[in-house]
Amino acid sequence: MSEDIFDAIIVGAGLAGSVAALVLAREGAQVLVIERGNSAGAKNVTGGRLYAHSLERIIPGFADQAPIERMITHEKLAFMTDNGAMTIDYCNGEDASASQVSYSVLRSKFDAWLMEQAEEAGAQLITGIRVDNVVQRDGKVVGVEADGDILEAKVVILADGVNSLLAEKLGMAKRVEASHVAVGVKELIELPKSVIEDRFQLQGNEGAACLFAGAPTDGLMGGGFLYTNETTLSLGLVCGLHHLKDAKKSVPQMLEDFKQHPAVAPLIAGGKLVEYAAHVVPEAGMNMQPELVGDGVLIAGDAAGMCMNLGFTIRGMDLAISAGEAAAKTVLSAMKRDDFSKQSLGEYRQHLDEGPMRDMRMYQKLPAFLDNPRMFTAYPEMAVSIARDLFTVDGSAPVPMRKKILRHAKKVGFINLMKDGLKGVTVL
């Protein structure tokens, strides 16, 4: 190899890019990571939950050294109206293996740590530089243009986030449709460690993950989230971009109203706002995926649409990590063959099919199922109304619970209930 040519150039030092760099560098590959932010993770925004299985496979016992916040042991799923909420609460008190747990994380700290692992293995990192173009020669990607310089590589891995302009320039991705992404806003609210543990009934490093549907996004597709960190709360909401044209409130106003909701306000009372961030996040999964493989190029992470919104949980970080690992394995195999053609790099799809694509394929119809206004208006209202009737005792003549439930179900419509229920069964 010429000293002027890297084995791989990775655009983006997020989870997919950092993991790809780590796996490649461990095997002696000459790797350069280019990050436009001032540090790894500086441009990344997420609610904050990492399912450990994918990174545990790459760095066994990573939680003992990584800057994780809390291990999630408490789950809450709330259906909200403007002034009420019906919440499903689950607590896992059983011992779980290292690959079965999940953690709340702060990406600015966690991504920086993960990139440090790649650098210690031999990868090189350049920050504060934007990649302007991907360089092609005879139809094959041979490097990138960054800050006026041409940097060459045998393969380029694009892990530059949702709405990858580089993938679009290569003709591997179409312009992102509004229906495929959502706008996410997040606040980091500081509270004493003991206060967080008291309010969420936590002990030690236990953590809580809370998702909210209905009122947080003013009845539009999306929802609110709250994750407990060690001394902060990650609070925010996500709303489908294509629905915002119908919104009666701005996203900042939605967030402010969410914070004032009686089910949320007591949890954040007395907290200090220490950070605010906004980001565009992928929502459509496989329905928005670009062409993942080209001559001399692979696409991974958010740039490849690696995200799953299942309603009851949201996954993205573990999928990005698996995609980064798959990309690295593919490049290592191609290096042995000295063949970086599209056909040779097609092995990437095989690795993905054994991991993230398997899960994404199973739930690929779910985004369309959730894109139903009743999910965020009629059903939260029905759930809260039934709960209110169940727990209200006012001395009046009792009404059988089945009649109360039927009364509220009629408001949704029995045909709608059957239609949505049948569709849900086929999707899930």
From Swiss-Prot:
UniProt GO MF annotations: FAD binding; oxidoreductase activity
Domain of life: Bacteria
Cofactor(s) this protein cannot do without: FAD
Keywords assigned by UniProt, alphabetized: Electron transport, FAD, Flavoprotein, Oxidoreductase, Transport
Stretches assigned to coiled coil: none
Keyword Plastid: no
Record Gene3D superfamilies: FAD/NAD(P)-binding domain
The keyword RNA-binding appears for this protein: no
Record Pfam families: FAD_binding_3 (PF01494)
NCBIfam families: PRK10015.1, PRK10157.1
Similarity comment text for this entry: Belongs to the ETF-QO/FixC family.
Described function: Could be part of an electron transfer system required for anaerobic carnitine reduction.
Full protein name: Protein FixC
Species whose genome carries this gene: Salmonella typhi
Upper taxonomic lineage: Bacteria, Pseudomonadati, Pseudomonadota, Gammaproteobacteria, Enterobacterales
